[in-house]
Every structure is written in structure tokens, then in C-alpha cells.
Design a protein with these regions (language model features):
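N-terminal amphipathic alpha-helix/helix-capping segment at the start of soluble metabolic enzymes
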Residues: 1-20, 27, 232
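Conserved, mostly hydrophobic/aromatic
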Residues: 26, 33, 43, 87, ...
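Glycine/Thr-rich beta-alpha phosphate-binding loop at enzyme active sites
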Residues: 39, 46-54, 58, 126, ...
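N-terminal active-site wall of soluble small-molecule enzyme domains
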Residues: 41-112
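Alpha-helix-loop-beta-strand connector modules within alpha/beta enzyme cores
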Residues: 53-74, 112-123, 161-182, 222-232
Length: 232
């Protein structure tokens, strides 16, 4: 399995959301997408930090043997440091926690990931200032910006999502952190992908866009065709 830092940097990455798969047939879905996905995005939620209850460690452990594609676990929980070890042991290659957890709580989970040789990231809710990522720039490989309300599917992209990506990209440039990847999560559609890429996204989290595709080769060829973003 490859770390996120080893994924290509010259094209848009697809961090495929398994929340949009047929959950009754998760293993076949993983096998079908494995030749194309750069990573699998697994949303894990405790029902408190967000309303949803989502993927749990035993489920991740069960599907881990069926693919070599990296697992990106997006942990939406009030106390991620209490859950991080279970998800890392289950097969997470990259663990993302929220800046809204606070520096102490998020930092503890990030440290657990690094101790196990895994990558770490932070996610930012739509109503949280982008600059909240600043304390974590030396500790993470990935920053995920939510473009919709967290833990909810099927929403339209918030108009400010593009400007937030540009702001994050500029912050990374100002602080010489060009190696940190920016992930756009939420409302990934054919009409939003080009603008998200142009605004600075290194990766997107597609769901129905790929799981409902009748021609995965064409869909992923189109996704990968988007050039390196130029932020203004």
C-alpha cells in the first residue's frame, strides 16, 4: 500500500467515498473501483460530532484484505484520540481529524497516526475559518475542506467553497508547505470538479459520480485530465 505522499502530484487525485457505494455489496464495489481509485475515503462518525453514525473499525478491517488502495479514514468524532488507535489498527493509511476538536484532542490523534507510520490530516467544517489549519501545518500531509455541511449527503456545493480552497492554497504557499495536499469533500459533480481543481484542490472525494458511472475508464480519464491548479 502506498502512502498519500507517494501518490501522483501532477494530476487530480480521486479519494473515492465508500459511503456512496452499495453498502450491501461493499466488497464487490471496492474490487470494481480499485483499479481506478487513488484512495478510498471512509467516513467514520460517532453520532455526536455529526448526526450520522458511519463506518466502524471492524467494517474497515473486513474490507482491508480486498484491496491495496490506501484507506483514508475521515474521523468525525468528539474525541478522536479515543478512537484513533482502533481505526489505525483496522487498516487506515491516512487518518483525518477535525480542527474543531481543538489542538490538544486533534493533536493527540495525529500523534497516534504518526507513531504507527501512517499519514495524518485535518478537516475543516464549512463555517470554520480556513486559518484554523495553521497550528497543524507541520504535522499533517492532508487538509480536507468541506464544501457542504459535514456528515450529510446530497447537498449542493456552498458558494464559498471555491474561495476557501484558494485561501488554503495561498496559506500553504505562504508557509512553504507545498507538499501538503488539499482535498475537496462534498458535492463532487461534473460541473464542480473543474472549478474545484482550478481553485486549488489536489484531490476530490467523488461518490455517486463514480459509483453511478457506466464507464469508469472514461470517468477517471476525465477526472485525471484536469491540469495542475493555478490559484489567483
Amino acid at each position: 500500500m502506498r502512502a498519500w505522499s507517494q501518490l501522483p502530484s501532477d494530476r487530480l487525485l480521486a479519494d473515492v467515498s465508500l459511503w456512496s457505494a452499495d453498502l450491501a455489496n461493499l466488497e464487490p464495489a471496492v474490487r470494481r473501483l480499485s483499479p481506478w481509485a487513488d484512495s478510498f475515503h471512509l467516513d467514520a462518525a460517532d453520532g455526536h460530532f455529526v448526526p450520522s453514525l458511519l463506518f466502524f473499525p471492524d467494517l474497515i478491517r473486513a474490507i482491508r484484505p480486498h484491496t491495496a488502495v490506501p484507506f483514508h479514514v475521515h474521523l468525525m468524532a468528539e474525541y478522536p484520540s479515543q478512537l484513533a488507535t482502533e481505526f489505525l489498527d483496522a487498516g487506515a493509511d491516512l487518518l483525518t481529524v477535525h480542527v474543531e476538536n481543538g489542538e490538544r484532542e486533534a493533536g493527540a490523534a495525529i500523534e497516534q497516526a504518526h507513531r504507527r507510520g501512517c499519514g495524518a490530516g485535518v478537516a475543516v467544517k464549512l463555517d470554520t475559518p480556513v486559518r484554523a489549519v495553521l497550528p497543524y501545518l507541520d504535522a499533517v500531509e492532508v487538509i480536507t475542506l468541506l464544501g457542504t455541511e459535514v456528515g450529510v449527503k446530497g447537498c449542493n456545493l456552498a458558494p464559498q467553497a471555491y474561495d476557501r480552497l484558494r485561501e488554503a492554497r495561498n496559506l500553504l504557499q505562504e508557509h512553504a508547505k507545498r507538499g501538503v495536499r488539499l482535498v475537496a469533500d462534498g458535492a463532487i459533480r461534473t460541473h464542480t470538479v473543474p472549478e474545484l481543481r482550478a481553485a486549488g484542490a489536489d484531490a476530490i472525494v467523488p461518490g455517486s459520480l463514480v459509483f453511478q458511472s457506466a464507464d469508469l475508464e472514461s470517468t477517471f480519464r476525465w477526472l485525471r485530465s484536469h491540469s495542475v491548479p493555478t490559484v489567483t
